[in-house]
Each structure stands twice: as C-alpha cells, then as structure tokens.
Amino acid sequence: MNNNICIVYTHHKLGDLIWQLPYIKAISSHHNCKVELILRGKTQAKNILKDLEHIDNIIYNDFRKGFYYWIDVIKLINIFNKKKFSHVYILDKVNKPAIAAKISGIKNIIGPGFGNQKKWLTTNKFLKDEDWNLNYSEQSQELLKLHNIKLHDLYPNIDINIQEL
C-alpha cells in the first residue's frame, strides 16, 4: 500500500507547533515517507520548516468558527479529495478535519478522540478523559503510544539550510 500521510494541527502559536515536531517526525518515520501538514497560516511554517526533510508540503487553512466553520470543512474536503491521503492524523481535539476526512472517505483517521471527535475517527483507540488535562505535547505523546508509533526524540529539531540564508 502506498502511504500518503497528512498531519493536521490547528493551533496558531508557533511555539506549540514547534513542540509538535518530534511527533510529526515520528509519524513520518513510522510510515517511512514524507508527510504533508495542514496548519494555520499564522504559524508561517512554510518559511520556518522548509528545510525539514520529513515534510513534503505545508498547506494553510484558517480553522475558523461560526459560519466559516463549514467553509473550512469544505476546503478540507477538497484538499483531501485532491491529495487522496491514506492517513489523516489530527494532533488536537478539533472535529473539523475529522469530519472532512470522513466525508472524503479516508480510511485511517486518527486523533485523540476527545468529545465528539471520536464519532469521526476510524480508530477505536482514544486518549482517556483525564488526558484532557495534559498539555498538547503530552497528548500527542500518548496518541503515538496508543498507535504503537515509536517516538525517537522528545525535543524539537529544526534543520536550516545555511546556504539559503
């Protein structure tokens, strides 16, 4: 089977994203392929993460609320249908990417499963209710453990091509 992996992280703070890098790399290593990320544009990740070899592409999405919630779901459905991902990993509790992935027919939708999100996931492995009290990094650690994905390093690393500076 050809893996085409997408990882969704909806928080807009760059620091929170940086702390997710070890988990993103672990998922890439687990599937032995580069991954695509869907992130908020406010992170400026396309500039900051461009030299990481395990990241193939970064797509920006707004992850808005209210009326725009459904516009963003439709945008995600279009992305998922175009890219034909085999797996979508959601590294937080949001429903939007899980709903879009389910509508798009993605077979492997994996996330922490807090609240209503578990209705849209294709796995029956969810974080425990008390894991809600963990920080984002610890929640991602637990999610990877649940799915037998080996974490090689707890600390983030950003590669920078100094010739391009």
How should each PLM-predicted stretch be described?
Residues M1-L165:
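Catalytic machinery of carbohydrate-active enzymes
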